[in-house]
Amino acid sequence: MTNRLVLSGTVCRTPLRKVSPSGIPHCQFVLEHRSVQEEAGFHRQAWCQMPVIVSGHENQAITHSITVGSSITVQGFISCYKAKNGLSKMVLHAEQIELIDSGD
């Protein structure tokens, strides 16, 4: 089964860094995406806020460069978890992160 998502956007919540009891570092933030997509011959505004989690030592170095307002592209897989309120929430598990040069 294929489960692959590539999403570009702007970090809209301060990254939260934690280390699990087993010593695995995690970084969580929310990525906001806005674009215009073509569907059935019409232009459509696309918008979402996607929770992202970066786990493991491999990508932690780049997470220290990520702040609110950073433009990034994230590649990974999506999964759901049950929130404290009992509702299912989708999250993007990042496997690759690329900072987008703002051109400044």
Swiss-Prot record:
Pfam families to which the protein is assigned, alphabetical: SSB_1 (PF22657)
GO biological process: DNA replication, synthesis of primer
Cellular component GO terms held in the UniProt record: primosome complex
The entry's keywords: DNA replication, DNA-binding, Primosome
This protein's record includes keyword NADP: no
GO MF annotation, one: single-stranded DNA binding
Membrane-spanning residues: none
Recorded superkingdom: Bacteria
Keyword DNA-binding: yes
Entries under Gene3D superfamilies matching the protein: Nucleic acid-binding proteins
Coiled coil ranges: none
Domain SSB: 1-101
Protein family according to the UniProt entry: Belongs to the PriB family.
Role description: Involved in the restart of stalled replication forks, which reloads the replicative helicase on sites other than the origin of replication; the PriA-PriB pathway is the major replication restart pathway. During primosome assembly it facilitates complex formation between PriA and DnaT on DNA; stabilizes PriA on DNA. Stimulates the DNA unwinding activity of PriA helicase.
UniProt subunit comment: Homodimer. Interacts with PriA and DnaT. Component of the replication restart primosome. Primosome assembly occurs via a 'hand-off' mechanism. PriA binds to replication forks, subsequently PriB then DnaT bind; DnaT then displaces ssDNA to generate the helicase loading substrate.
Protein name (record): Replication restart protein PriB
Origin organism lineage: Bacteria, Pseudomonadati, Pseudomonadota, Gammaproteobacteria, Enterobacterales
